[in-house]
Amino acid sequence: SYKLKKNDKIDVHNFNFSERVNKKIKFIYSPTKKELFSNSIFIENNENFVVINKPAGIAVQSGTKSKKNIIDILRKTQEFKDARPYTVHRIDKETTGILIVAKNRKYAQLLTSLFRLRKIHKTYLGIVLGELKENKGTLIDILFYYEGRKKIKTKAITRFSVIDSNNNYSLLKLDPET
């Protein structure tokens, strides 16, 4: 096996490939410290917030299962020399994507409110096994989580549309509502 590194090139000639993959493929990537501290992860940097391209393989916040995380790393950067990083939303550890981190309480509250009011929209791309019967639709499921010892259930709604597909895989645009 080969661990992908930044700037590695992967050629994809056509999404509608005909060869069937008979085994599960799992890409595990953990960025190096050099990559995490490089300026290439910063998309926007101003006095109130940063927008970064969060790599897969690293958690946003510390937790029981994650030793390194984006917030602790940002604390050590020049961009947060005189500021404290505030998370305003999260992305799963294994997901690559845009992450906004506030540099002060005022912008943390503002950006958190904009996410809560759905003024800032998240969109994901995903590859799933098989072809979907419908090109557009809504996925509704129930999620469970705990607040302390209390089990909370909430509805999860995601709209999807098929961008491309073949007999084996479908490339989807996913827009979570909740």
What are these regions (language model features)?
Residues S1-T178:
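RNA pseudouridine synthases
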